[in-house]
Amino acid sequence: MKRDFNEFKEFIKGKNVAVVGIGVSNIPLIKFLVKLGAKVTAFDMKSAEELGGISKEFEILGVNLELGKGYLDRLTGFEVVFKTPSMRIDSEALVRCKNQGAYITSEMEEFVRYCKGKVYGVTGSDGKTTTTTIVSKLLSQEGYKTWTGGNIGTPLFSNIEEIKEEDKVVLELSSFQLMTMDVEIDVAIVTNITPNHLDMHKDMQEYIDAKKNVFKYQRENDLLVINDENEITKNLDKEAKGKVVRFSSKKTAGEDAYYKDGKLYVHGKEVCKKDDIIIKGMHNVENYLAAFLAVYDEVSIESMKKVAETFGGVHHRCEFIREVDGVKYYNDSIASTPTRTLAGLKAFEKPVILLAGGYDKHVPFEPLAYEGYEKIKAIVLFGVTKEKIKAAFKRLEEEKGIHVPVYSGESLEEVVNIAKSIAENGDIITLSPACASFDMFKNFEVRGDKFKEIVNNI
């Protein structure tokens, strides 16, 4: 049951509130809390100089700042603590606050708790952003006022009083955001679950349990959309409290949405042809099937078809950059796991020269080698994981006698030059790293933008 936001306004007014992390989502949150009458202290590991103008702006607003080395040691004596999504609830600082009686929450939890509009929550190891965007496009096409947030779009909590009951709200939710989520989400979509973020989660089970929170607090009238091809998600119906619908790109029996003979179907009705979908690849067929099921009660088949035939995709997802000397370059920087890279490779009709590597999330790379070799003409590695990926391809050669040429470089510029030097007329070069970007770049967008800049300067 959605609660009246006036309750929150009364609760937060005059409270001594800590906000951990001065990032994209927390900057508007801090300003909003000040507006609601809270006494706010903002915490961040960066210095005032590193934060730039925002630190001065906060000082003018009366926000106390606790910055730099040891900043979490000073997180004590607060009535309310808004944590950053990646901060574990069992961290020493938060355990200390909880023992002191603090209410610990996050921007996303409070938003979902008080949001009047119907909430669609999208999670999964791969396909979250594209599926979230498709759901938003479908609802907008049908004429609904649609708000998009979570991991993408703009932070929504500060806009909560503008969102009406008839509005639709589509959220991309990460495992970090879901770990402490204990509120009802009207429509939950789980695209797939494969090993991911094992550098942050204690183990795979904790990661799975976090994902389950997207539907754990649903009631009988709510909806759960699951991937019937994924070994983990196909069994989630056993724990569901609401209605469950399934999608599959490989089988039709018992499926609520499926792909057959080049066409996509939802609840037995043909929606569109695969060849008419602008964004290519079977992973995008699955993203559409999931989205169609999520909005089936609100969106017409005509609107579904229109979006599929006009939506050109999201930046950094199998994004065509340019063709140089007969070689096509694609940016798939979003691919931060081996499974997402495999899905991207399947979108191409011929083997590609793959640029891969980056930050180590402690996931195995054998699937990339053993399942992807037919789609890889050569692989050029960079980043912290390059030796780990190289070892997976070496194992493939030793065990199966399958040789994939492996090259490596130190920088993105160097690997692009290596790929360019081995490419022939008609080849495809794609950046699809199978890893996060944090060893060399702030995020996958910065990595993708740098790649595009390099390619556009060839």
Curated annotation (Swiss-Prot):
At the top of the EC hierarchy, this enzyme's class is: ligase
According to its UniProt entry, one GO biological process term is:
regulation of cell shape
Would you tell me the Gene Ontology cellular component terms? cytoplasm
Keywords of the record: ATP-binding, Cell cycle, Cell division, Cell shape, Cell wall biogenesis/degradation, Cytoplasm, Ligase, Nucleotide-binding, Peptidoglycan synthesis
Listed under catalytic activity are:
UDP-N-acetyl-alpha-D-muramoyl-L-alanine + D-glutamate + ATP = UDP-N-acetyl-alpha-D-muramoyl-L-alanyl-D-glutamate + ADP + phosphate + H(+)
Looking up InterPro entries in the UniProt record yields: Mur-like_cat_sf, Mur_ligase_C, Mur_ligase_C_dom_sf, Mur_ligase_cen, MurD
| Presence of the UniProt keyword Zinc in the record | no
Q: What EC number is given for this enzyme? A: 6.3.2.9
Q: Where does ATP bind?
A: G124, S125, D126, G127, K128, T129, T130
Question: SUPFAM superfamilies this protein is in?
Answer: MurCD N-terminal domain (SSF51984), MurD-like peptide ligases, catalytic domain (SSF53623), MurD-like peptide ligases, peptide-binding domain (SSF53244)
Location comes to: Cytoplasm
Pathway info: Cell wall biogenesis; peptidoglycan biosynthesis
Q: Which Pfam families match?
A: Mur_ligase_C, Mur_ligase_M
| Example GO molecular function | ATP binding
Q: Which family does it belong to?
A: Belongs to the MurCDEF family.
State the protein's purpose.
Answer: Cell wall formation. Catalyzes the addition of glutamate to the nucleotide precursor UDP-N-acetylmuramoyl-L-alanine (UMA).
Protein name (record)? UDP-N-acetylmuramoylalanine--D-glutamate ligase
Q: Which organism is it from?
A: Clostridium perfringens (strain ATCC 13124 / DSM 756 / JCM 1290 / NCIMB 6125 / NCTC 8237 / Type A)
State the organism's lineage: Bacteria, Bacillati, Bacillota, Clostridia, Eubacteriales
